[in-house]
Design a protein with these regions (language model features):
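Conserved, structured core segments of small domains
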Residues: 1-122
Length: 122
């Protein structure tokens, strides 16, 4: 299971089309995803304080596009050593097995929602 963070409006736009194509797909050639062990760090670096987020739970076996685990150049000020899952193409929505609310805490930080905490970790 891999996870993708997105804004509610992006999800609402994708649903009628049956696929999700964020700007990163055109700009970088892939859709950024995270494992359960990576998603909170990702959210805290890139989405701190955002109040309109959702977490897509994606079954990678159902993806039509190629999935690659790649080490990013940087994440914020950090140079990670762990590869992140990247979807190299549009996300077919039938690969999304669940959508969870992903609210930030009062201080703007994130923690795993209960529905995600119960998933097997990587």
């Amino acid at each position: 299971m891999i996870l993708h963070i997105l804004r509610r409006a992006e999800w609402d736009d994708a649903r009628p089309r049956g696929e999700y194509r964020p700007p990163s797909l055109d700009a970088e050639g892939f859709i950024h995803c995270s494992t359960i062990g990576q998603v909170v760090v990702t959210a805290n670096i890139f989405f701190s304080g955002a109040t309109d987020l959702l977490l897509l739970q994606i079954d990678e076996r159902k993806l039509l596009a190629e999935l690659k685990y790649e080490v990013p150049a940087t994440i914020g000020d950090e140079r990670p050593r762990t590869p992140f899952p990247h979807i190299h193409g549009a996300l077919n929505l039938d690969a999304v097995v669940a959508v969870a609310e992903f609210p930030c805490e009062v201080d703007g930080s994130f923690k795993l929602p209960p529905s995600i905490r119960d998933l097997p970790s990587d």
